[in-house]
Amino acid sequence: MTYDETKAYLSQYYYAYQKVDSLKEELRCLEELANGTQGINYDEPVVQKSRSLKAPFIRYIDRIQKKEEELSQKVEELLNLKDEIHEAIATVNDPVMELVLTYRYINFWEWCDIASKLHYAESYVYKLHRKAISLVLIKEDSKRQ
């Protein structure tokens, strides 16, 4: 794989993580709607009609359940992807370069934080990263994107 393809493969976890985070936020909003109080609409004319005896949160329950199932599935996929990426990073066989890749692609650290943690100059961390990317071996069946 090329340098850019390997970086894209390792970056998949970040985007999957963001998707899970987004689903959690959607679920939180739905739960907030279900648990919130309903307002009165004064714009419509008052018409005598039969009142619904269903609780107002009932209409959100199905949506919440579907979103929870989707979230559960995405979390499972996220954990599997994380394991795959850990395996790929482990193929580098150099502890410092593995740390650079782990900090960057699993922990989502900024370059300056990685350099500070490892007590290296940021430019040297870039050099280690470039070399580590070239050493990563990705299984054929793992090459999804």
What are the functions of these language-model segments?
Residues 1-91, 138-145:
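N-terminal interaction/assembly modules
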